[in-house]
């Protein structure tokens, strides 16, 4: 207003369905069975390559609170490479936070069939400290996964309508608060199913075709302002 700046058009990323597939593509059921995780055991899933940004330390702290109460629940984190990342072994760092239940914390690494893992998961969790636009959350919702995210800057609140198609927690929510909500959802398959079914709507809301139309409409408006 004061600097006479031109109007800006900001569009989110689209989601293509089905999600792209590429190698490696380990079957989640077979991969987990080799680690004594049966198809009937509940699975918490997180995805990301940067542990601190994604709040995986928060996630592991929460899981530590739940592990004794739910001995059959496992936590899978996709995307973290083995060995040092910018001088830090992220997998080892997280395992050290969970000494009593580290055998229930699994790191398949980077996979190219993430859709299969979303569909295997009972809950998708994103306790990020900050985001740009969380593609992994968009993908999980498009897969019909029940999702819980921190309401961090920026992005999750653009995707999740709290209590309608997912759940949002304050960015500074404690591990205890996370554990309470995750416990509620683990014990309520009906609520998980309702939230996951409603989340499928992002396939239309963030489709390539719809965002293409939004872009063209925005361009026409910007040109018309000249």
Put a short name on every predicted segment.
Residues 21-37, 92-94:
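A short helix/loop element that forms part of the nucleotide-sugar donor recognition site in Leloir-type
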Residues 74-103, 191:
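Short, structured helix-loop element that forms part of the nucleotide-activated donor/catalytic region
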Residues 38-54, 60-63:
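Conserved donor-binding/catalytic core segment of Leloir-type glycosyltransferases
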Residues 110, 129:
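Aromatic "clamp/platform" in nucleotide-sugar-dependent glycosyltransferases that forms part
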Residues 146-150:
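Short hydrophobic beta-strand element within catalytic cores of glycosyltransferases
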Residues 208-226:
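C-terminal alpha-helical cap of glycosyltransferases
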Residues 1-27:
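Donor nucleotide-sugar binding/catalytic pocket of nucleotide-sugar-dependent glycosyltransferases
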